[in-house]
Curated annotation (Swiss-Prot):
Signal peptide: none annotated. This is Ribosomal RNA small subunit methyltransferase A. Its EC number is 2.1.1.182. The gene is rsmA. It comes from Burkholderia lata (strain ATCC 17760 / DSM 23089 / LMG 22485 / NCIMB 9086 / R18194 / 383). The keyword Methyltransferase applies. Pfam families: RrnaAD.
């Protein structure tokens, strides 16, 4: 596989984190994993040169119900519009600022399926942005750096367990679906990739916790990973009765379950409401 940044006459742009998927066997496996069906509301983030776009359109799009795509690179937008016409509705702009809820069906029922080969340089911020639309989403399938996927699905007590693990596992059921080697891309990235499936919990399955407070607690806990929680969560010891929660502060952040972090955030909310 050539290391050239040019593919199909387009130079991959480093500032956009562009690595184009070119292995048709991998593309077929990804599409089979997604399982698109006619008439579904699907959004592709970063369609690039259309490697996934084409088979997705073949399986689900009609002029009345097109595949939606969010693309930042204006050079690619023109090519995609010319190639797919009315079967692809393109939204020019940055996915980090895009209102995905604007594409959902009317009503409260989840209706969106979101897919994409996400730019690795913005993957974590983009995942957190997408979390704000989770109530409108049926599922998400993303190509990401394998290290990020491992952190997303990591169990407590492992080195990969992180702030990203806690915040996403609170909101989604997640599963690593496929490994994708560097040679599947043009130009090949310097890291291994993987496909992850993310299914949002339904409202009745979610714990009653303010995600902002949960994020505050988790960020503090993981701010110095090698230190004990009695140090990183020390500022909360005057307001939260950790003993009453059965929460052992003589641990490190990666040794605490999602449910335990939720419990601390709930206790913090109760204290602040009372105060």
């Amino acid at each position: 596989m050539s290391n050239s940044r040019q593919h199909q006459g387009h130079f991959a742009r480093k500032r956009f984190g562009q690595n184009f998927l070119v292995d048709h066997g991998v593309i077929d496996s990804i599409v089979s994993t997604i399982g698109p069906a006619r008439g579904q509301r699907m959004v592709e983030i970063g369609p690039g040169l259309g490697a996934l776009t084409e088979p997705l359109i073949e399986r689900l799009a009609t002029p009345e119900s097109p595949l939606h795509a969010v693309e930042l690179d204006r050079d690619l937008i023109g090519r995609l519009q010319q190639r797919f016409g009315a079967l692809l509705e393109l939204h020019a702009g940055d996915a980090l600022a895009f209102d995905f809820r604007s594409l959902a069906a009317p009503g409260d029922k989840p209706s969106l399926r979101i897919v994409g080969n996400l730019p690795y340089n913005i993957s974590s911020p983009l995942l957190f942005h997408l979390m704000t639309f989770a109530d409108a989403v049926i599922d998400q399938h993303f190509m990401l750096q394998n290290e990020v996927v491992e952190r997303m699905v990591a169990e407590p007590g492992t080195k990969a367990f992180s702030r990203l693990s806690v915040m996403l596992q609170y909101r989604y059921v997640m599963e690593k679906m496929l490994d994708v080697p560097p040679e599947s891309f043009q130009p090949p990235p310097k890291v291994d990739s993987a496909i992850v499936r993310m299914i949002p919990y339904e409202p009745h399955e979610l714990p009653d916790v303010d995600p902002v407070l949960l994020g505050e607690v988790v960020t503090a806990a993981f701010s110095q990973r090698r230190k004990m929680l009695r140090n990183t969560l020390g500022d909360y010891r005057e307001t939260i009765d950790f003993d009453a929660l059965g929460f052992d502060l003589a641990r490190r952040a990666e040794d605490v379950s999602v449910a335990e972090y939720v419990g601390v955030a709930q206790a913090l909310a109760a204290v602040r409401k009372a105060g």
